[in-house]
C-alpha cells in the first residue's frame, strides 16, 4: 500500500515536470514566433516605405519655408479681425454696388446729368413746379446792330422759374437793322426774328411777369438795360456779383460758364455750340439755388429791420417796376442812370432799396457786353 502511494506520487511529480516543460517550450515558441512576427511586420513596413530621394528633401525644405511665412490673404490689415459673417456681408454689398454701377454705366451721360441739374426730367415735373412762383431767372440774347455789328440789341428773352421750368421764351423783332446775328454765340438766326413780336410787346409782357418777383440773373443789369426796364434792388439776386461766388471763382467778374463748372459740375456754352438763353437762365437759377440759404442769411444780416421790414420794402417797391417810354422828341430824359453803375446791385439799404425807372437811350441800353471783356 505504501509502495503504491509512493509510486503514484512519483508519477504525479513526473507528470507535472513534463507539463511544465511543455508549457515552457510553448511559451518560448510563442514568444519566438511573436518576435519573429514583429520582425516580419517591421521589415514589411520598412520595405513599404518609399525611399527618400534628394527631390523629396528639397520639397520638404520648401514646405518648411512655406509654413514659416504667413498665409497669403486678400484682406487689408485692418480687416483681418473681422468675423467671416461680417466679411461675407461686406462682399455681398460690394458686389451689389458693382452690379448696380454696371447697370448705370453708359446711361447717365453728361447731357442727361446737365438736364437733371438744370431742370430735371420732364416726366418728373409736376404741375406745381411749372408755375411761375416767387423766383424767376432771366437771360437775354443779343444781336449786333450799327457799323459792323459793334452794338448790341435785344433778340431773345428767356425766363425760368425756381425749378428751371420755362415760363417765358420769346424772340424779339429788332428795332434796328441787324448787321451781325452772332449766331455762333447767340444761337439767333434770321428766320427766328421774322414774324417775332415787337420790342414794346415783349417788354410789356416781361414787365408784368417779373413784377413783385425775386429776379435772378447773371450780370442782370445787362438784361434790364436791354429791356429798358427797372426792378427793385431788394428783389434782385445777381450771381455775377455775389461775393461768395466771386471768392470761389477767384475773380471779380466770374462768368456763368465758370460758375456752372465750379458750383454745378456741368459744362455749358461749349465751344462750337451756340448759346441758349433758356439754358443760361436755368444754369443761373441752379447756381442761385445752391447759394440761396447763404444768400438769405447775408441779406437778413444786412437788413437790420429783419424779415418783416424786407417784406414791406418788397411790397412797396413792386410798383417801381415800370416800362420806360421814349419822349415825343425821341431824346432821352436822363442819360445818367443807376443801371450804368457797374457796382454790385446786391448792396442795398432802406434808402436805396427802391429806385426809379431806368431812363436810357436805346443805344446806350444796348451796350451791355462790358462784363464779357473781364472774363
From Swiss-Prot:
Keywords: Exonuclease, Hydrolase, Nuclease, Nucleus, rRNA processing
Record-annotated Exonuclease domain positions: 134-297
Subcellular location: Nucleus
InterPro entries, per the entry: Exonuclease_RNaseT/DNA_pol3 (IPR013520), REX4_DEDDh_dom (IPR037431), REXO1/3/4-like (IPR047021), RNaseH-like_sf (IPR012337), RNaseH_sf (IPR036397)
EC number, UniProt record: 3.1.-.-
SUPFAM superfamilies the UniProt entry points to: Ribonuclease H-like
Purpose of the protein: Exoribonuclease involved in ribosome biosynthesis. Involved in the processing of ITS1, the internal transcribed spacer localized between the 18S and 5.8S rRNAs.
Biased composition (Low complexity): 25-35
Main location: nucleus
Gene: REX4
Keyword hit for Nuclease: yes
Top EC group: hydrolase
Sequence similarity: Belongs to the REXO4 family.
Keyword Nuclease (UniProt): yes
Organism: Mycosarcoma maydis (Corn smut fungus)
Name of the protein in its database record: RNA exonuclease 4
Example GO BP: RNA processing
